[in-house]
Amino acid sequence: MSMTPREIVHELNRHIIGQDDAKRAVAIALRNRWRRMQLPAELRQEVTPKNILMIGPTGVGKTEIARRLAKLANAPFLKVEATKFTEVGYVGRDVESIIRDLADAALKMLREQEVHKMRHRAEDAAEERILDALLPPARPVGFSEEPVQSGDSNTRQLFRKRLREGQLDDKEIDIEVAESPAGVEIMAPPGMEEMTNQLQNLFANMGKGKKKSRKLKIKEAFKLIRDEEAARLVNEEDLKARALEAVEQNGIVFIDEIDKVAKRGNTSGADVSREGVQRDLLPLIEGSTVNTKLGMVKTDHILFIASGAFHLSKPSDLVPELQGRLPIRVELKALSPQDFERILTEPHAALTEQYRELLKTEGLHIEFLEDGIKRIAEIAWQVNEKTENIGARRLHTLLERLLEEVSFSAADLAGKQQGEPIRIDAAYVNEHLGELAQDEDLSRYIL
């Protein structure tokens, strides 16, 4: 990650409106991973990441920050919900499976990168195999031991040219490809995922190396052979060693819904399991060793980012040890009408642009006017205030309701449209949403 914190925030601004404190915190944390790797080896071991706790109502951008961060980081990244895990001894997944999943994500990411690097070599090899199938080598005549070239050189070059131009894409050929391992579905009780994976790998390896002849169109055959050749060029042992290093040094885990495992002050009973999940998370966040398919993974330098709405509990309801292991606290603010306006227009691939382009595929043109966008933002904010505050997700509900008739009749309307777009202004919004927004009972159930 060679991007500076300012560049990371700038990139996040393309997709997420507001929440500058949270963006700055994750940008600094991400940059610190790079800074740490520049230190001498001895000092590097002593520098541990400062984990982050993001607090804020639902729908304000906590999860979206995590999603965008994953794309920016180019590092092993895993997003999990805290509610999926149970205390050791209860039925369900244990928290160590987080690190096992992170190891799988790292291996997959590095394999994709390696295959991408080998793409050109794999394409050349695939091209040669297809040309061999199109122009089989001639058999030697009599007792001659001289090697026979695969097809006449000029003919081969002619076929190569036609293959690259796509003229042979629909021609069928018989080709030998690696046989897909039989998919073995193993049902196992929760918490036994590791054993299930090992058994599935065992069955997959049993059929490895077998080939079978298939009749395929050249376009499909080329993709299959290219992937097969690329996989053959990748050094699996080297890949596993690099993936292990990447997980330990650059891994990032985003734990969502952390507030759902917080012990609430006035309840008891099932909360024992919640507190147990927190206690199981402690050694993972503090630093422990977990057995994965890559080997033993040390979690000392994995960055943990936890987030939660905390509308039924408080951060202080988390066990004190866990609070101490999440030293950086960032509060995300509830959205204002102005924020809703910006969400509708400013981000890359904003909601209004998505609907405009979707309907354009039917030949129907719609235009969102400024007063229309302002009115949608006002209604979204009002409904959130009157009923449950679900943040920016309210806009999805409103826009679906607003454009329901247009979406349903898009093909018919496109035929009648005389070059004039359908204009979504304040009057149009009031006509379709005004009554629902005013009636609290209706908005509670429909919006």
UniProtKB/Swiss-Prot annotation:
Keywords: ATP-binding, Chaperone, Cytoplasm, Nucleotide-binding, Stress response. It holds the Pfam family AAA. This is ATP-dependent protease ATPase subunit HslU. ATP binds at I17, G59, V60, G61, K62, T63, E64, D256, E321, R393. It is found in: Cytoplasm. NCBIfam families: hslU, PRK05201.1. InterPro entries: AAA+_ATPase (IPR003593), ATP-dep_Clp_protease_ClpX (IPR050052), ATPase_AAA_core (IPR003959), Clp_ATPase_C (IPR019489), HslU (IPR004491), P-loop_NTPase (IPR027417). The lineage of its organism: Bacteria, Pseudomonadati, Pseudomonadota, Gammaproteobacteria, Pseudomonadales. ATPase subunit of a proteasome-like degradation complex; this subunit has chaperone activity. The binding of ATP and its subsequent hydrolysis by HslU are essential for unfolding of protein substrates subsequently hydrolyzed by HslV. HslU recognizes the N-terminal part of its protein substrates and unfolds these before they are guided to HslV for hydrolysis. GO terms for molecular function: ATP binding; ATP hydrolysis activity; peptidase activity; proteasome-activating activity. A double ring-shaped homohexamer of HslV is capped on each side by a ring-shaped HslU homohexamer. The assembly of the HslU/HslV complex is dependent on binding of ATP. GO terms for cellular component: HslUV protease complex. GO terms for biological process: protein unfolding; proteolysis involved in protein catabolic process.
